[in-house]
Amino acid sequence: MRKKIIIGNWKMNKTKTEAENFVKEFNKITSELNLKLDKNLVAGLALPFTSLGIKKEGNFANLVIAAQNFHQNNSGAFTGEISAEMLLDLGVKMVVLGHSERREFFHETDEIVNMKMHQAIKNNLVPIVCVGETELQYNSNKSKEVIKNQIEKSLKNLSDFSKIIIAYEPIWAIGTGKTATVEYAQEMCKYIRSLTNEKTIIQYGGSVKPNNIKELLSQKDIDGALVGGASLNVKDFIDLIK
């Protein structure tokens, strides 16, 4: 049985002080609710680099900490970059790779994502590899063609699909308030599974909120969610994972 994995992606939001306040409020509310995570659920947050070393205490210690990016080389003259070894030293367990914002604003290619994926696995980090189509591609009925191409290139030479997570995020639904229908999200995640295998954990991302996550996660081929804005509010995040 595949686990459900819900990761909140904070993107470039919250200072370290704000993150520490989030932890305090998270611990306070979850203690009052006597909240215990489902044994089949892994929940976590992809934090900015400045907050990755945040102290894990109380119920917050049950969450997995993920990074939002790292460099494909172990070390070297790469000013401003972070290595897998540095992430591991901070207790990071997962890393988001190939997010559409990285692809668009920093010109990350499938080939770069592929190198990062292999580097993550080599260093015992779980890569969350993001794929998704633009609104133009969606309207042109090219969604599956685009996803297949991204999967083939980003996951090239991957021998064990149980070592990764794939996050399907239709770009037209990220931060727009538009959400793919549950049927469409399931159809695309099922298609991704046909390109990988039954062991692959597949998340859906794109305007996921407390009021739609339950229906999304009830689908056969949707194993979790990569959540943006809703994870920034501690009460909303708790509603997502409880």
From Swiss-Prot:
What residues sit in the active site? 99, 169
The terms under GO molecular function for this entry are: triose-phosphate isomerase activity
Organism (species): Mycoplasma mobile (strain ATCC 43663 / 163K / NCTC 11711)
Q: Where in the cell is it found?
A: Cytoplasm
> What name is this protein filed under?
Triosephosphate isomerase
Quaternary structure and partners: Homodimer.
Supply the enzyme class, top level: isomerase
Where does this protein act, in terms of pathway? Answer: Carbohydrate biosynthesis; gluconeogenesis; Carbohydrate degradation; glycolysis; D-glyceraldehyde 3-phosphate from glycerone phosphate: step 1/1
PANTHER family with a match to the protein in the record: TRIOSEPHOSPHATE ISOMERASE (PTHR21139:SF42)
Annotated InterPro entries: Aldolase_TIM (IPR013785), TIM_sf (IPR035990), TrioseP_Isoase_bac/euk (IPR022896), Triosephosphate_isomerase (IPR000652), Triosephosphate_isomerase_AS (IPR020861)
Family the entry assigns: Belongs to the triosephosphate isomerase family.
Q: What's its job?
A: Involved in the gluconeogenesis. Catalyzes stereospecifically the conversion of dihydroxyacetone phosphate (DHAP) to D-glyceraldehyde-3-phosphate (G3P).
GO BP term (any one): glycolytic process
Write one Pfam family the protein is assigned to: TIM
One Gene Ontology cellular component term attached to this UniProt record is: cytosol
